[in-house]
Amino acid sequence: MIKFKFIRSISFISFFISSVCFSSMHVKGDEEPSHIAESARASNRGFGYPKLSDVSFSSRRFRPENQKDPHDTFSTLPRFFSTRLDWVYDYGNQENIIGRTNALGLNYNGAISSILPDEIGGFVRIRGRDRSVNGDLSVLAHLPSKPAIGDVWSKQYIKIASNHVREMIRLGADGIQVDDPGMNYAEAVYREGGYGDTSNEKFSLWLKQNSSKKQRRNWSIDLDIDEFSYREWVHSKGGKDHIPPDLKELHEKFLLEGLLQFYETLRKVAAEANGGVQVPFSCNTSSNVVWKDYSKWADFGMAETRMNNISPMKIWRWVCSPERKIGKGHVLCPPRYDALTPPANIVPFTRSCIATTYAMGSLMIVPWDVWQKNNGGPRYFGTAEEYADIYGFVRAIPELFEGYEAVFCRGGGIPTSIYKFNKSPVVLQGNHDGVVAVVRCIPKSESAPVVIHLVDWNKPQSFTLIFDQTQFFFGNKMAFNLFTPTAYDQNLHEKIYAESIFNQLALVKELTPERHPDGKLRLLIPPLNPWGIIKVSLK
């Protein structure tokens, strides 16, 4: 009878590996054995990107915020076995938060945005602000307080942002996350902003240097007029939709130039505050998880996601598709829903998202205090009972995450032909409609174990994994062990955290393959909840 056992040590696992092995394949015809790790390529996810076995926790504000707040940042953080505290805005309480985070040995990444207050810990937003074409302050309209957006050409806002960055680094922050990274450039491109007082003044001189007199005559613009105001000129024409496209393009180019200079300044400020050592900057790459001209400067992305815009295929495209144009990594936020109350499937759906994101070589932030509803609805706070086993599983077996790269994926609509294998290394069979398989290897290693992540997005059922051993370890002897998360138990989890014995957060099960006449191996996989990892080891 097969029994589940806690993982005690590498030597203990080695005992299992040595107990299940298979002789080398007899190669038919001109088919030569190979090793799938030869196809793996190392990824550069960006300066400062988290470890692949990290657990990212986010508390947008320090909690409890008041006596009525039932949530507590630092009592909740260890329940998910967190290694990082990311994307934190609480400027007035930074010394307390960063100090406590550092004392726990965790990585801390503070956040800045387009709506920084004039003073650290303050609430007034007047200095150095962007304006719309009619002269009103540009604001983030989806937030109840309608905070005013900064003008990146303004020395006042540059100073405000620099002060925030400098203070975070001084207190011990390890990195900076930038929310709404498009600032007033994005306001000009997508909304009605981009006409802050400083930008408006500087654009007249910039336009004179970057356009010809003939162009300006065609636009009916006279830059020699004292106190020419581009904002007023556009307003007189009826708004940006009524100005020549080439002029609009130049205005956006000017704002983008200022934005990139703004971030270059903040990088220098952070490095100076850090003793001359560069500090990683990430930025919000939106719920579409895309790199824009205003975000490509960042070292890596921290992206929001939505339930209606996330799937195995989307995660694959975002984090591990061989055809990604920009190789920088993304840390994903858990999927957001747009109703006032969580949908019935929020927990299983989110668990599958978390597992798939890790399986494909990225991280998903713990679903706790991570986004605000546009309509002012309550924030979502997932519990340890719902999600801690998934994150604990990652902490239990970091050696099966670090250094590994996706070399083959299937299921969830992922096109296997993109991987250029003559034959699929693994095939799913049986009740596998919702199963996603990700084969991961350490590039070029002939001896490191291969891992096969399996995530079931449907109601868990047993299914079969067909394994072509001619493509693994040159057809040599192998052993198979299935790792799954230890079920959540509050007392056990608290004990494990207190004693740092994280390997007890995974269970291991020996798998005995069935050899078929075609030479391939069949592995019967038990129901997953929703995640399992097969470790394929060379004997």
Residue ranges of each PLM-predicted region?
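Solvent-exposed beta-hairpin/edge-strand motifs
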Residues: 468-505
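C-terminal beta-strand-rich structural cap/linker in extracellular carbohydrate-active enzymes
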Residues: 503-539
